[in-house]
Structure formats: C-alpha cells, structure tokens
Amino acid sequence: MKFNEFLNHLSNYEPGKDIEVIAKEYGVKEVIKLASNENPFGTPPKAIECLRQNANKAHLYPDDSMIELKSTLAQKYKVQNENIIIGAGSDQVIEFAIHAKLNSKNAFLQAGVTFAMYEIYAKQCGAKCYKTQSITHDLNEFKKLYEAHKDEIKLIFLCLPNNPLGECLDASEVTKFIKGVDEDCLVVIDAAYNEFASFKDSKKHLEPCELIKEFDNVLYLGTFSKLYGLGGLRIGYGIANANIISAFYKLRAPFNVSNLALKAAVAAINDDEFAKKTLENNFSQMELYKEFAKKYDIKIIDSYTNFITYFFDEKNSTDLSEKLLKKGIIIRNLKSYGLNAIRITIGTSYENEKFFTEFDKILR
C-alpha cells in the first residue's frame, strides 16, 4: 500500500522505555524511571479522590464546553474562557497551531535543540524548519534568522524552559523579542515547565494575561503532565487571543479530552500542598545532581525544570544509558538529538540516591 509522500521524511518520536519492559528485558526486580519528567510523587491526592468519586462515570462523554476547567484556568490566569482551549496534552494544542499556520509554502523557527514534536508535526504539513546554530535559545540568532526569512516564517516556537536542556529566558527578554515579530507570525510559548522556572526565579515567570493583552499573535501552552502529575490522563491547554482560539476550534474533534481527565485537572490545580511539595523537593534534590556533576567534571546547563542534563566529552551517552538500564535505572539518552548527553528526571530522594550510587560505580 502506498502512503502520502511526506511520511518518507518523518521519523518516529522515541519515548523512554517502560518500567515493565526494562524489568523483563534485563531481569531486574526494581526499576526506577527517571526518563520522562513525570512527577516523582505520583498523582495529587485531591485528583486521586476525584477520580475515585467519578470512576463510575467513565462511560459518559465529557461536557464538551469544558466549562468547569476553563473557568478554573480563567480564574488562575486572569483571562476569559474564550481565551482558552483544552487539548489531549499540550501536544495536541501544538498540533492545532501547526495545522492552523503552516503548509508546504512556509516555514517555522525553533532553537537548535528543543522539543522534538514541533518538527515532527510541522513536517506533516510540509513546512520548512529553520533552527539556530546554538542548541539553546539564543534570541539574537532567532532575530537574525527571522529577519532573513521573515516572508517564509509564520510560526516561532519558544520552549521556556527548554526541553530537553532545561535553560530558560527571562520574561523581559521574551516580550522584547516578540515586539519584533510581525502580527501574522504566531509565537508559541511552550510553558510546560514554567511553574518550575517561576519557583526558582521570578524573572522567568510568564504571565499569560499580560502576554495576550499586549500581543495578538502569542499562544501560551500549559500542561497537567509535569507539576500536576496527570501525564497518563493526557490533558493540557492553550491561552491566546480569542480569534486564535476560535480558529483552533475548527481543528478540534469533539470530546477530545475525557471527562475523568477534565475532573482530575480541576482537582489537581487546586492541590496547592502537592504542588509546593513537588517544587521544593525538585530544587533541593537538583543541588545533589549538581554536586555529583562537579565531582566527575560533568558539564551541565543550569536547569529551571524537573530534570537535569549531563553532557559528556569522552564517555558515550548510549553506553552509559545501557549500563544504567542493566541496573534498573531508566534515563533519557539524547543521542537522537545529536547530543552526547543524558537527561535525568529529578526523582524522590530514594530514587536519586539509587541513581548516584549506581552511576558512581559506572563512572569509576
């Protein structure tokens, strides 16, 4: 059977291996997953209780207006319901943005190394990709590339903080850059990890209400997969000018998010104690990862997320990843990004100590 030609130019996204697969493949009893930036404390207690109470409603289609979650988000971010769209993860909203703006006759712009799905989705539309030489977000490079190809570039991705590297721009730098972008070019701010960045440094905090008030061409993305521990329920959102949201709704299938995900998201966003515990643990434990890196002269980029990336000169990241798997520890090998590096999710104190103990043996 023949398929569309563009499929020949696409690669599959490579997620981290599952715990069950590793346990069976390597014959290990205990497996620690530090690969997918999931919340180490699991699902928020309030969301768990909500799921228990609503489990008998799994046969029902969701309220397609999603009014309860939209109202909760609108109150949190000081925007209107009409400024919000809910997706099956923020990935789906990324897909909406790409299909709304890109085609085979135009292009998009991104950092040299960033979230892989931008390029995967955009290639489905045949769009051209412009990347900075820098692997991180160098806005001077962004500006030069944009100015050189302004007629082509109709969408710009800013991943703040950046996955898989962890760096983050100051909010003032971001707004200054957007002022130089034409109104017909959509600027997507992927803020999947911004709660972590804001907790660490208030200068990194991005406020959607201020962004969409000042700019008609900005889309702010958020997710419940990281801080709020609902990755398995697949729910995220976009906040933008009402005209942008209205256009996206033409691309959205009805009932795209389950009723259980919608209910759990409302509960999770109101579980302040869980969020505080997650953030405090994350950055206290990250200091231990920095100390470990210093001990072995491993290069790092200061991370504003719930993960840290280790860069190697002589050691091979694929070899290191394989050795860790044999010890029952799953991390993310970044060879597919062209980097000799590994990304490690910040886990619980127990999980992190297990990583340090085993990785110490490997590096000796």
Swiss-Prot record:
Its cofactor is pyridoxal 5'-phosphate. Keywords: Amino-acid biosynthesis, Aminotransferase, Histidine biosynthesis, Pyridoxal phosphate, Transferase. Its EC number is 2.6.1.9. InterPro entries: Aminotransferase_I/II_large (IPR004839), HisP_aminotrans (IPR005861), HistidinolP_aminotransfase (IPR050106), PyrdxlP-dep_Trfase (IPR015424), PyrdxlP-dep_Trfase_major (IPR015421), PyrdxlP-dep_Trfase_small (IPR015422). It catalyses: L-histidinol phosphate + 2-oxoglutarate = 3-(imidazol-4-yl)-2-oxopropyl phosphate + L-glutamate. Homodimer. This is Histidinol-phosphate aminotransferase.
